Amino acid sequence: MSDKQVTTILFDLDGTLINTNELIIASFLHTLEHYYPSKYKREDVLAFIGPSLFDTFSSMDPDKCEDMIAMYRAYNHDMHDSLVTEYETVYETLDALKKAGFTLGIVTTKLRDTVNMGLKLTGIGEFFETVVTLDDVTNAKPDPEPVLLALKQLGSEPAEAIMVGDNYHDVLAGKNAGTKTAGVAWTIKGPEMLAKHEPDFMLEKMSDLLQIVGVK
């Protein structure tokens, strides 16, 4: 299925372009073990992947939320380079899209310092003309604000853009902003979860995106 109207492609970062799942899970378990010893296991924290840290920790204890976020981020920063990898066909796909003249951006719920660490580690930062992080917005995904900000910075309209992500927050943010949407089947929560939110496309691997936008 080809759609040649797309000129701009926005990507989520964690779980979409780079595999930070083990880092995120380890960071949650480290933090929660400190505040709630023996209460949370690996399977319990999967639901926390996607929402902002504030949303997750404030729902547990509003008074300790900022302290929990600080502990999470410190551990996440320290362990970043040893636990983060790049997904299959990501680099090659971004390279092909860039050479074909597409405008590329990142829309993430992470802070800029850890975003930059991931881009540097994997070498994919060169492909993106804008990177919208949690630092840049008032409302995180699924609110359309970060998607609309990225499009504004790129000089693109929602109708010519596609938002790619591994979480329902990404799909809903794209829909709320008026873009097309693509889910990734390698989401840790399973493609069935993502399919419930009816993305326009589902990618089995990142290179599937090339056919969708008409790159040979």
Swiss-Prot record:
Pfam families (alphabetical): HAD_2
The protein's enzyme class: hydrolase
CDD domains xref list: HAD_PPase
BP-aspect Gene Ontology terms: DNA repair
Function statement: Hydrolyzes pyrophosphate formed during P-Ser-HPr dephosphorylation by HPrK/P. Might play a role in controlling the intracellular pyrophosphate pool.
NCBIfam families from the UniProt entry: HAD-SF-IA-v1 (TIGR01549), HAD-SF-IA-v3 (TIGR01509), PRK13288.1 (NF009804)
Protein name: Pyrophosphatase PpaX
Organism of this sequence: Bacillus subtilis (strain 168)
Gene: ppaX
